[in-house]
Amino acid sequence: MDIVVNPEETKKVKYTWAYPRFEYNMTYYQVYNNAGSGYFTLMENPSSFDISMTYRFLSGDGSTGYKADYTGMALAYREHLIDEGILTEKTESDGDIPMRVDFVMSDVKKSVVGTEQVVTTDVDGVREILEDLSAQGINNVNSGLIGWQKKAETLAKPYAYKFSSKIGRKGEFEELFTDFAAKGTDISYSRDFVTINKKMISFYTNAAKHVNTWYLMTDKSVLYPANCPIFETGYALPSKTAEWIRKLSGKVSDYSESFTITGASNILTSTYDRNGVVSSLTDAEELIRNAVAAAGENMKINLVNPNQYLWEYTDRYLQAPVGTSQYVFETDSVPFLQMVLHGTMEVYGPYSNFSFYTDSDILRMIDYNISPSFIFTKEPSYLLADTVSSDMYSTEYEQYRNLAKKVYDGVNSVLSQIRGYEWTGREVPESGVIVNTYVKNGAKAQVIINYTDSDVNCLGTVTKALSASVVK
């Protein structure tokens, strides 16, 4: 489905309208030889699906119904999703907000013969860092482990449950999980179940194909370093993705309280063969939904930027967007998604150690009501320079130890005061000043966020420059 908006930028029309556009057929490039020669043609059989649309009309200033602006739209959409059973309101406990701490444990690079697994955080390193965070007063933590397995994320089969002694044996991982679970810290395995490569697994029975029957491939040679073991990636068959999620989650559910899924959370692909469609997007959605639902029966589910059809099963929304797409010029960015999801799941921002840690960024987390997240390694991040994880260019915990405390305390000092409140409104009384309104059991709390370089007097309270305050 496309959203078509008029007028276009070249037309001087004084009103705007938008409407959905559903595409039952499309042109594609049909290849007929190995050289890539081909022609454009239509799909032989159009797609088959039912169309259903729900319209909610908003008007006025909110005195009767939802306000006719983005806050009213977000709240109306949230109400619709709750009515449909896609979102469920959850009781949020008082106290400190959570923080997400992920770890890059290893990855692989080319060696003189074959490949070499580069270890940046072993089991003891994870334990040491989490204990240090606790010693600093950061106790409400949940964590995901990336590259925990033998051959790491890059070369291990998506369902593989094998360990490397350099990182930690199975028993050491189980002990790590159970020890910290007793302290209230949830540690999970993280895995991408969609992105595959030919050194990881056979494409013949595992990779998705384009409608022209060529494998769906992405050339990443301009992104990956020269010594990286792979340069092309493909996409797993939806049926395989679902199978692998079930298989790996079933192996770890005995001692892990949650499971972190990447790739499958926000990538949805169809697949074809010479006879036509094998799995449509609708089929793929159903396969992955059922697999994630099954995994969530015994564990919490942590999803990276998940698509809406998975929100029903999402306990933690990771890497939530906090800016615009920058495809068009816009006057402002607003927390539409965050208002929709508020009170139904935990929502975390981008990794703060990748330039999301300034005073303005801390205020953005408060404004958007999202919890901070970091990704760490015990060893210096330059060890990952020749791996697929080379984009994790600044992760060494020792460099971010004090910053993690500053960011967490800055966000927690405000958001901990409104835990369990319902987010009901957002106003901009003047440029650079935001007032978010929350309600709990009839009591109102307002959070003033001052992005400006000057003190601001608002709601009878002086909020200092680049800071936030709570008025109850």
Predicted regions: what they are:
Residues 143-145, 189, 261-264, 303:
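Conserved beta-strand positions
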Residues 1-116, 127-136, 140:
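Carbohydrate-recognition beta-sandwich/jelly-roll modules
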Residues 62, 66, 115-118, 122, ...:
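Generic alpha-helical structural element
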Residues 2-19, 193-256, 265-472:
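Active-site-proximal substrate-binding groove within the catalytic cores of carbohydrate-active enzymes
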Residues 69-81, 122-132, 234-260:
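An active-site-proximal structural segment forming one wall of the substrate-binding cleft
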